[in-house]
């Protein structure tokens, strides 16, 4: 009897398909003879392109349809860019595997300027991320930030059409789509702290599906998983979402995790920063502890204001 194929739910954007095929290839390499199929679908996040994400439900718009497909048995797993995965999961589903992290940095893309510092006053910069906007406005309050939605190709086309002087994108996505040549410079974490989980690919499935969980086990990258769990524990404690500028980046130094994080106002007028070091065995607790420190240092008031504005 032929084993049932594994079905991967995925969005249809080039980057989503790259990620799904990456997991498909990894599964087939780890389990020769395994059949793996892609189940493509369109999410609300792909359709609603004329409104800022924070106003229409946040990044969860990109995963809800995939989760319904798994809960209804039409798919066995879903592949996500970890920076787009909400802090909470529906009953019966969970994040079971985190693959090795790609470059977590933001990338500066422009046809005219080599780096942020070269932009003239009043230059128009495109991003859909409040996190990037916050840090950019703090460093360069003289810049004009303009909403930028759509997949990577669409965003580059808008830049090329002259709608923006520069745009900020995730370096990982450009590298995966073999568009690294478009990157004029990388923005280091000291200048723009990445999003929670940025650059990592995560796999969600039904938590009681032991067959799928066993098949996925070889794809888990322990170092990346500890770093991302640390970042996500911080984000969960802050109840972070698309409506608030939150950045975090965890690094491993031997068996020690170094976590940096920030919470800020979208206009960059106030940013609360913090960092913590501790054993990787306590990755999640470190994230929780740093979040509590940020909350006590002014992040609580920022978050309350921002969430009130979106109610």
UniProtKB/Swiss-Prot annotation:
Pathway: Porphyrin-containing compound metabolism; protoporphyrin-IX biosynthesis; coproporphyrinogen-III from 5-aminolevulinate: step 2/4. Tetrapolymerization of the monopyrrole PBG into the hydroxymethylbilane pre-uroporphyrinogen in several discrete steps. One of its GO terms (biological process) is protoporphyrinogen IX biosynthetic process. InterPro entries: HemC, Porphobilin_deaminase_cofac_BS, Porphobilin_deaminase_N, Porphobilinogen_deaminase_C, Porphobilinogen_deaminase_C_sf. Belongs to the HMBS family. It comes from the Bacteria. Keywords: Porphyrin biosynthesis, Transferase. The gene is hemC. It holds the Pfam family Porphobil_deam. It catalyses: 4 porphobilinogen + H2O = hydroxymethylbilane + 4 NH4(+). This is Porphobilinogen deaminase. PANTHER family: PORPHOBILINOGEN DEAMINASE. HAMAP family: Porphobil_deam. The lineage of its organism: Bacteria, Pseudomonadati, Pseudomonadota, Gammaproteobacteria, Vibrionales.
